From Swiss-Prot:
It comes from Parafrankia sp. (strain EAN1pec). GO terms for cellular component: plasma membrane; proton-transporting ATP synthase complex. Keywords: ATP synthesis, Cell membrane, CF(0), Hydrogen ion transport, Ion transport, Membrane, Transmembrane, Transmembrane helix, Transport. It is found in: Cell membrane. The gene is atpB. This is ATP synthase subunit a.
Length: 295
């Protein structure tokens, strides 16, 4: 059942979850000049996820053998999925360069999301906007740096602001600020908000039914409590599916933006058109020995 931080019902009726469940109490805090630092359950879970993902992948690849087995085989399966189905499928052959980052990104977001249904934890760290914003900022920084290194700052920003060089001047004047806002502001913002909103709303909905079952089961209307409990179980399974989907979408869009920066045709729309979530998949060289070649 949900943690004690959730307001429960006593004799005054049922109380559903409030946004306070996403604001855990600080375990300790300190000031560093004008900046306040605090450490709480969210901080601990975020640190745990980072150490878990890093340690898991390190253990899987630290003693790689020609024929992968056990943990190495599992880790390479994850890497191959991201490398072939996301990096190369969206970016192209050059996507291999970004496969390590995309793999870590996918695994980190996935484990962070799954924290919502792990006993004791029961808190998706991506349901706090700070973490999705940081992840989006890192992806934003990478695809812009890639574009600048690939084409030079002048060409990259010119192609971004003027995606249609043959268009009339007044069209260019209208498009330039729109393209700037779209690439430099809207992309990282939508990456962060999409992930945050899905995890926040999903966890709130799950809490409603879990709290409803906890409140109704001891009552004469216990049948409704059973229904609420079954809904909580069903929503847990549904949330697991959403956890995977949101990690996949975030990673695919990051790959699409990197691919767009490499092609520098409209700053990313070209690559986005070829991403699986835009309904068009390109062929990618799939080799059964892909993991062996890297090992």
């Amino acid at each position: 059942m949900p943690s004690g931080s959730v307001l429960m019902a006593a004799d005054d009726g049922f109380h559903g979850p409030t946004p306070d469940v996403f604001k855990p109490k600080s375990w300790f805090e300190f000031d560093l000049g004008p900046i306040d630092f605090y450490f709480n359950k969210w901080s601990a879970l975020t640190l745990f996820v980072a150490l878990f993902v890093g340690g898991f992948l390190w253990l899987g690849f630290r003693k790689a053998t020609l024929v992968p087995r056990g943990l190495q085989n599992f880790c390479e399966s994850i890497y191959d999925f991201v490398d072939l189905q996301i990096a190369q499928n969206v970016i192209g052959e050059r996507g291999r360069t970004f496969s390590p980052y995309l793999t870590i990104l996918f695994c980190f977001i996935l484990v962070s999301n799954v924290m919502a249904v792990i006993p004791v934890a029961q808190f998706p760290t991506t349901s706090r906007i700070a973490l999705p914003m940081i992840l989006a900022a890192v992806s934003w920084f990478i695809f812009n740096i890639v574009g600048i290194r690939e084409h030079g700052a002048g060409t990259y920003f010119k192609d971004m602001l003027v995606p249609a060089p043959t268009a009339p001047l007044f069209v260019k004047v209208i498009l330039a600020p729109i393209e700037f806002v779209s690439t430099m502001i809207a992309r990282p913002a939508t990456l962060a908000i999409r992930l945050f909103a899905n995890m926040f709303a999903g966890h709130m909905l799950l809490l409603v039914f879990a709290l409803g079952a906890d409140y109704l089961l001891p009552k004469p209307q216990f049948v409704f409590g059973l229904v609420s409990g079954l809904m909580a179980i069903a929503l847990t399974l549904f949330e697991l599916m959403i956890d995977v989907l949101q990690a996949y979408i975030f990673t695919v869009l990051t790959a699409a933006y990197i691919g767009g920066a490499i092609s520098s045709h409209g700053g990313g729309d070209h690559a986005a058109d070829h991403s699986p979530i835009h309904g068009h998949e390109t062929s990618a060289p799939v080799t059964a020995a892909g993991a062996v070649a890297r090992a």
